[in-house]
Amino acid sequence: MSELLSFALFLASVLIYAWKAGRNTWWFAATLTVLGLFVVLNITLFASDYFTGDGINDAVLYTLTNSLTGAGVSKYILPGIGIVLGLTAVFGALGWILRRRRHHPHHFGYSLLALLLALGSVDASPAFRQITELVKSQSRDGDPDFAAYYKEPSKTIPDPKLNLVYIYGESLERTYFDNEAFPDLTPELGALKNEGLDFSHTQQLPGTDYTIAGMVASQCGIPLFAPFEGNASASVSSFFPQNICLGDILKNSGYQNYFVQGANLRFAGKDVFLKSHGFDHLYGSEELKSVVADPHYRNDWGFYDDTVLDEAWKKFEELSRSGQRFSLFTLTVDTHHPDGFISRTCNRKKYDFDGKPNQSFSAVSCSQENIAAFINKIKASPWFKDTVIVVSSDHLAMNNTAWKYLNKQDRNNLFFVIRGDKPQQETLAVKRNTMDNGATVLDILGGDNYLGLGRSSLSGQSMSEIFLNIKEKTLAWKPDIIRLWKFPKEMKEFTIDQQKNMIAFSGSHFRLPLLLRVSDKRVEPLPESEYSAPLRFQLADFAPRDNFVWVDRCYKMAQLWAPELALSTDWCVSQGQLGGQQIVQHVDKTMWKGKTAFKDTVIDMARYKSNVDTLKIVDNDIRYKADSFIFNVAGAPEEVKQFSGISRPESWGRWSNAQLGDEVKIEYKHPLPKKFDLVITAKAYGNNASRPIPVRVGNEEQTLVLGNEVTTTTLHFDNPTDADTLVIVPPEPVSTNEGNILGHSPRKLGIGMVEIKVVEREG
């Protein structure tokens, strides 16, 4: 209803101003600005829905100030370009319409009415309401009743008798199991769901809407609200350190806790969270690659679901035979947006909807088949009678190719329980949310029926039942939940541990690199993660007077304030204000101690603009002084005009990447010498080893042969044509996720370059 009212007010404002207001520059500018704000808000809402499926939420607030990287980003480039072009066209059209009768005399009354209607359209828009609520949630002090509803359970289960298998299905919401809406999509897992305790109304609340947040909510009974963006939590050293979570209770009760997934455990800090709360045995892509049958059988995120669930079954067998009480948690990945992935062992590889194949539905149908096969193995085993199996989604599906069809349904998260000791078949329609999952499991295992803000759906009353406005209530509790981190409010002294790559201050520890915004009563950590912008881009968003401490590789800050460190990959500490004074200190000891020293200087806006512009220079445009191309730092020597076909810097150097160009091409600003030696320090990847690799300068070609280890080769070139470009052509680039950023598409690697040097020969 508010959408219609908002649009009606917008339309009325446009029509009244265009046909009645007449000519006046000030009123035109004011009305166009407000109407333009309406357009921007609604396009933001549309774009946010495209990415999150949940309008403008915490994730969007973070994304608006950071880059969106990760799985399938290329899928979103075209829609993003479309939005920008559409916005430009709408603004142009709006200005043209408003000035249609600019030759008529100005009418104050109609101008005022048009402006008021425009303001009303903004105020009535859902986008404005969502942003207002989000901003309020950032500034509230908390809610006085939080302590009354947040309850810590007993730290142990008396006389535990059941083992636990807990399966998180990535984005595998209950909506997919509606056979009328999506016929025969989930027959195997749907049949198992109908055999157990099926909770049909599990809400998704703020702070529970992405994987690590869903895990925290289901195991600790609280949303993931933190003094930093949730997916960046890989940088913290402990996770809600004061809270009692399900894993803590299980460990205290004699359980050995295991977690198995196909992706890297470090992503979003899952390893930190689990280790902080009772899990001593963790298996992710790094741990599994030495034990799986085919370590090369991977998708963009890690190992496919069939591989992961096979390993989970082996672990279940091993632990069951040992007689040791255990919990086994596992997380799938094949249903990750935007398209999902199809395991090769599936029978259900294709699902058509709306008359055409749909990749997301196909991934769901395949993944549920794998999960069902895993559960059926457990059910057929002699250990099932001592086992409780839980299946839940980590969160609702984000924008994937099935999303528009999901949105036509009443959407809920998946949560069902199969008890080997006490078979129960029932669908429970009680209102609940993700935070109730852990409390329900704890209740079944013989523990308390509450956990944080969660309540058992078998014997307690969910917050979703107590509060009709539970989403607003959850946001009101946000400051209280953030305080549970016990995060420091000041930073005066700090220590950098080079062996552990950690920084410590005021009792808190963070992984490096790290950027901190420091004010009188708050220290805001801004870690670097797969989903965040590089720290220098985040720093560029700071205000001129914001105090910062930035710990990163020296070369990343050298171009601003320490050019002598432009080739150093050591740690450096920079602090100051972008509009004031900055200092850079080289970390030259294993345990390096520093102090914050922010001077109250006069702000220089020209200096601020220069710093921001430099911080925003993209990696490939950075230039440094050197007599060779050093590949383990960003940018290139000053003599290089441009280059292509080369991947990002890594600690040792850079790979060629055929996804960025079939050949490595380095163009210099001036012609290369008439006679020179080309000294190449490099290695080959995969089938490129021991193969002739053409290296060309102008019309001359030499052959380079590399092995899998780094070697240095000197090639002799004559350059009579004054060519200025060096070309290297890897013979057989290999598509691989080796060393890739989690969630990115595979790279096509050919050669790994450490250094290339041009040495002029006499004569």
Swiss-Prot record:
Keywords: Cell inner membrane, Cell membrane, Membrane, Transferase, Transmembrane, Transmembrane helix. One of its GO terms (biological process) is glucan biosynthetic process. Pfam families: DUF7024 (PF22895), Sulfatase (PF00884). It is a multi-pass membrane protein. InterPro entries: Alkaline_phosphatase_core_sf, DUF7024, OpgB, OpgB/LTA_synthase_biosynth, Sulfatase_N. SUPFAM superfamilies: Alkaline phosphatase-like (SSF53649). It is an enzyme of class 2 (transferase). It catalyses: a phosphatidylglycerol + a membrane-derived-oligosaccharide D-glucose = a 1,2-diacyl-sn-glycerol + a membrane-derived-oligosaccharide 6-(glycerophospho)-D-glucose. Belongs to the OpgB family. This is Phosphoglycerol transferase I. The gene is mdoB.
